[in-house]
Structures are given as C-alpha cells and as structure tokens.
Curated annotation (Swiss-Prot):
Catalytic activity: L-glutamyl-tRNA(Gln) + L-glutamine + ATP + H2O = L-glutaminyl-tRNA(Gln) + L-glutamate + ADP + phosphate + H(+)
UniProt lineage: Bacteria, Pseudomonadati, Pseudomonadota, Betaproteobacteria, Burkholderiales
The encoding gene: gatA
An example Gene Ontology CC term for this record: glutamyl-tRNA(Gln) amidotransferase complex
Species assigned in the record: Paraburkholderia phymatum (strain DSM 17167 / CIP 108236 / LMG 21445 / STM815) (Burkholderia phymatum)
Record-given protein name: Glutamyl-tRNA(Gln) amidotransferase subunit A
Record function comment: Allows the formation of correctly charged Gln-tRNA(Gln) through the transamidation of misacylated Glu-tRNA(Gln) in organisms which lack glutaminyl-tRNA synthetase. The reaction takes place in the presence of glutamine and ATP through an activated gamma-phospho-Glu-tRNA(Gln).
Length: 497
C-alpha cells in the first residue's frame, strides 16, 4: 500500500481493500523503521490512530470526501493542537500549540489523518535541512546527500514513502527545491492562495504553504482542501474557491480531439538566464530531455528573458532577513519558548534566551535584517530591494506576453553532500538562483521529477520547474499531469523502499 499515490489509496479505501486505521498503522511502522532518515521530529501514534478511527466511521456512514482517511505529514512550521510545534528550533523545542493552523484544520476537516510533524530548517531558514536543532535529514535516494530545504523532512517523508503526502512552505524555494532534490512533486501557489494563519512566520510577504506528494494530481486534490480565503490572514486572497483538478487529463485547447498531442497550443517559455553558466551538465541534460517530451506532447518552446534573475539573490537576502528580524522579535523567553535558566535582569534574560534558543543561521539573518532596517541604511538597502522586487515581477509579466508557462531547472545542481556547503552560506544562497525570483514576484511555481544526475550523482533526482502566471495553478497542474501521464519519473522510489 505504501507505494500508492493519494488517488490510488482513495480507490483502495473505497474498494474496502484496507481501512484508514490499517493505512495509518502501515505508515507509522514505516516511520519507526526508518528513523535514521530523521524526517520526523514528532510522532504520536495514539492521536494518529484516533483520527484514523474517526475517518473509518465517516467512510462507513457514507460521508467520506476525496481525502477522508488518507495520511498526511505536516511540516513542523504549522502549529498543530496538542502536538509539539517547534519550527525546527530549540526556541520552541517543547512548545505545544493550543490551536491548529488553518492548513492543518482544513485538511483535518477533509478527513485526513496526521501521521506526524516533519523536520525542517530552523524557522524555515535554509536550503538543505542541515539547520534544524533536531539534526539534518538524510536524502532517501542517497543517505550522504541533503534532501533540500527548508521542507526537507516533508520531502524525504514522501520520497521514502513514510507518508503519501505532506505539507510544506515556500519562502524562496522551500517546497520546490526539496521536491526536486528528493524526486517528488510539490507546488507553491500564488502568494495568498493558502492561509498563513498558524504558520510560524519567517518572511511574511513571501511565506506560502503548499502540498508535496508523488503526483501533480495528488497536489491538486490537496490544494483543493488547503486553499481558499481565510479572514484570519490579512494577506489571504478573496478569489472564489477553485477546483484545481478541473483540467487534469484534458487537452490544452479543450477541444478533446488531440489525444496524441494533448498540449498542442501550449507555449513554453525558456528564460535564457536559466540555461547559462552555472547550470550543471547533468541537470541540463535532464531538463532538455523533459522539454523534448513536452514538444512530443505538442507544446511549442519559445525563448524569453528574465533579465533581473541575478539580482533576485541580493534582493531576497535583504527583504527576507528584514522581515525575519521583525517576526522573530516575539521570541523573547517571556510568553512562550525557551527561557535561559540563569539571568541577572530582564534584558539579560532576553539576551541569553535568544542566544541559547536560536541557531547560527537564524542569528545571521536576524543580524542582517536588523542592519538593513536600521537608520541610515533603510533607504540604501531595504527600500532599494523593494523597488527591484517590483521590476522582477514586471519582467515575468513581460515574459508571459509570449508564453503560457515558463520552464527551467529548479536548482543549478542535484543535491550536494551533507556538510559540503555548511561553512559557506553564500554558496548555499546561490543554490536558490532559479526559485527566488518566483517567490519575490508572488507567482505560483512547482517542481516535477524529470531525471537524475550523472556519474557519482546518478542516484540524485532532478526536478523541472514549471512557473505560471498569477492564479494559474490549475493550468500548471494540467501541464505537469500531462508530463506525468507520459513519463514515469514520479513513480520511481529510492532503493529499499
């Protein structure tokens, strides 16, 4: 059962081939047997089985929805009632939330069964899942490699079939990059599509939740439940709720008469900036092969330009740390979170609690953010970065005049070895070159498995990035689903799984 996708598990439940409790027990045992991956930071079998029993009751009563009884793992950045919610930090090591994040609540209302909370880079700050207080996550494809970050635990859990799906968050690539490195499918929706209420904040103008699963069809099902307006999130979009599955299996034109060329009429934009120096040859080969497959499906490839791509790194690493320094000021050891055992006075308690509670990367970003927001530097750094951010968004709109979707690599390379970039944060930041601009513009983007590296990296997956215009998630999922109907990269699993 553990090899099945969400849609296949739904069919198995409907056919009475298994129960929700049996499914939950299967995944709980797999999580226990594969602890060495370090994908999970908190598992509570009692709560999981209680949820599964409730789901079985709904199924027996004929009240099951599309997701009822299906297991889900939650990134530990989403607060979850009666579960530890740590954001991968010592600061929140023992914090138990009194309420559910909107994402958690909506998936629970849909009948999904939580099998645990997944590991992550501390406060979602990282690209490798090495910054977690609970230790690094291993990539199931190659235990020496990182799984990507910051949603590395979620990606590893889905890749290793410890859960059929998981939630993630994406601030600068934290759904797409680990999905690419771990050989699964993940989508970051348009900013505001998924509520941030109960999502422990990193950078509020960038953070966005999304689903991670084996297939685009699974992601569409999850997004149906996760998305929609939430009055408790001031940045939540008021758009009418959509059915993100509505185009799956259809021709791009909608005429229904092009089964051999289902994507005839689709224009795929290829940014020349995404295919230049710095892109590894093995990644380029996998992306080129995927693009040839799209041509075989009827799509037309056109060159476009995103001229400010290189500026996305400095812009992001001004704006995101600035917002983080503000958001993380709430962790002071007074109301909740870690408090130093010994201190002289209130100020000393603040200093020691934060010094002990935050890890090195979080401290680095707080310092950078505080600096760029300080008097005398605000205009030179933060304000300038916001102006360039607007230009980056305009570049995408110009590109979309010539294409329907944009495609390219998710990352310049496959996953690197654990520890390989830990001493050089700039090298780590450069790995996000193809994802940051999408987040800065607030656009939807996704990663789809499309191949593997070469030589010593032959077991390390490569992901194809698909970028859509605002609110175009349903069409992006259609494009990804067409590729997955024609290929089997998404079906592949790590050895021993």
């Amino acid at each position: 059962m553990h090899e099945k996708s969400l849609t296949e598990l739904r069919a198995a439940l409907d056919a009475k081939q298994c129960s929700a409790v049996e499914l939950a027990q299967t995944y709980l045992k797999r999580i226990e047997d594969r602890k060495a991956l370090n994908a999970f930071v908190h598992v509570d079998a009692q709560q999981t089985l209680a949820q599964a029993q409730a789901a079985d009751a709904l199924i027996a009563a004929g009240n099951a929805g599309p997701l009822t009884g299906l297991p889900i793992a939650h990134k530990d950045v989403f607060v979850t009632r009666n579960w530890r919610s740590t954001a991968g930090s010592k600061m929140l090591e023992n914090y138990t939330s009194p309420f559910d994040a909107t994402v958690v609540d909506r998936l629970a209302q849909a009948g999904m069964v939580c099998v645990g909370k997944t590991n992550m880079d501390e406060f979602a700050m990282g690209s490798s899942n090495e910054n977690s207080y609970f230790g690094p996550v291993q990539n199931p494809w190659d235990r020496k490699a990182v799984p990507g970050g910051s949603s590395g635990g979620s990606a590893a859990a889905v890749a290793a079939r410890l859960a059929p799906a998981a939630t993630g968050t994406d601030t600068g690539g934290s759904i797409r990059q680990p999905a690419s490195f771990s050989g699964i499918t993940g989508i970051k929706p348009t900013y505001g599509r998924v509520s941030r209420y109960g999502m422990i904040a990193f950078a509020s103008s960038l953070d966005q939740g999304g689903p991670m699963a084996q297939t685009a069809a699974d992601c569409a099902l999850l997004l149906n439940a996760m998305g929609g307006f939430d009055e408790r999130d001031s940045t939540s979009l008021t758009h009418d709720h959509e059915d993100y599955t509505r185009y799956l299996g259809q021709d791009w034109s909608g005429a229904g008469n092009a089964r051999d060329k289902p994507l005839a009429g689709l224009r795929v934009g290829l940014p020349k900036e995404y295919f230049g120096a710095g892109l590894a040859d093995d990644v380029r080969a996998s992306i080129d092969a995927a693009l040839k497959q799209y041509e075989a499906l009827g799509a037309t490839l056109v060159e476009v330009s995103l001229p400010k791509t290189e500026l996305s790194i400095p812009v992001y690493y001004v704006i995101a740390p600035a917002e983080a320094s503000s958001n993380l000021s709430r962790f002071d050891g007074v109301r909740y979170g870690h408090r130093a055992a010994e201190y002289r006075d209130l100020l000393d308690m603040y200093k020691k609690s934060r010094a002990e509670g935050f890890g090195p990367e979080v401290k680095r970003r707080i310092l950078v953010g505080t600096y760029v927001l300080s008097h005398g530097y605000y205009d030179a750094y933060y304000l300038q970065a916001q102006k360039i951010r607007r230009i980056i968004a305009q570049d995408f709109q110009e590109a979309f005049r010539h294409c329907d979707v944009i495609m390219g690599p998710v990352a310049p390379s496959v996953a690197w070895d654990i520890g390989a970039k830990g001493d050089d944060p700039v090298q780590m930041y450069l790995a996000d070159i193809y994802t940051l601009s999408v987040s800065l513009a607030g656009l939807p983007g996704m990663s789809v498995p499309c191949g593997f590296g070469a030589g010593a990296n032959a077991q390390r997956p490569v992901g194809l990035q698909i970028i859509g215009n605002y609110f175009n998630e349903a069409r992006m999922l259609q494009v990804a689903d067409a590729f997955q109907r024609a290929t089997d990269w998404h079906r592949m699993a790590p050895a021993g799984v």
